[in-house]
């Protein structure tokens, strides 16, 4: 982690405590990231509290929360993920982007806010593995306006660890 910091590359995941210092802000957009995979779990209540505090300190910022969470190779989010996502939105997040399961999971709208549970894989050396779904992922394009959020999905596929766009974007 020290090497990444010296190279000015942000990272999350700490074996003992939540990374409370991973906040990036620029041009009215705030970004928080948390790890929810063993053994680097940040407790749900701490995540919700950090989100709440961040939103209170930056009420006009569009707050994006990224979560490394979920169960690998599961095509649907778990009840625990859904409960945490709702807590995070209730605490003030404007958008949640998740990853870790290595497959794309559903998108939910909760109280007018979007939750991308898992974007699947983008660049990952899974060419020799058993599920074709691990060779697929999503890139999310965002346009953030004061009154609305516009997004586009760009499906990607990977071959020999090289991502490329699929034919259709949504």
Where do the model's predicted regions map?
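Acidic, metal/ion-coordinating pockets
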Residues: 1-170
């Amino acid at each position: 982690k020290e090497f990444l910091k010296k190279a000015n590359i942000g990272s999350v995941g700490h074996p003992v405590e939540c990374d409370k210092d991973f906040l990036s802000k620029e041009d009215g957009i705030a970004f928080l990231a948390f790890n929810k995979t063993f053994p680097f779990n940040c407790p749900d209540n701490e995540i919700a509290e950090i989100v709440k505090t961040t939103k209170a300190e930056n009420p006009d910022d569009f707050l994006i929360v990224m979560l490394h969470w979920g169960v690998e190779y599961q095509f649907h989010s778990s009840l625990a993920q859904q409960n945490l996502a709702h807590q995070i939105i209730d605490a003030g997040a404007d958008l949640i982007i998740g990853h870790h399961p290595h497959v794309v999971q559903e998108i939910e709208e909760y109280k007018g806010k979007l939750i991308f549970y898992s974007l699947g894989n983008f660049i990952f050396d899974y060419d020799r593995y058993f599920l074709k779904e691990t060779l697929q992922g999503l890139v999310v394009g965002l346009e953030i306006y004061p009154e609305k959020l516009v997004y586009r999905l760009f499906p990607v596929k990977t071959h020999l660890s090289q991502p490329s766009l699929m034919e259709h974007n949504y």
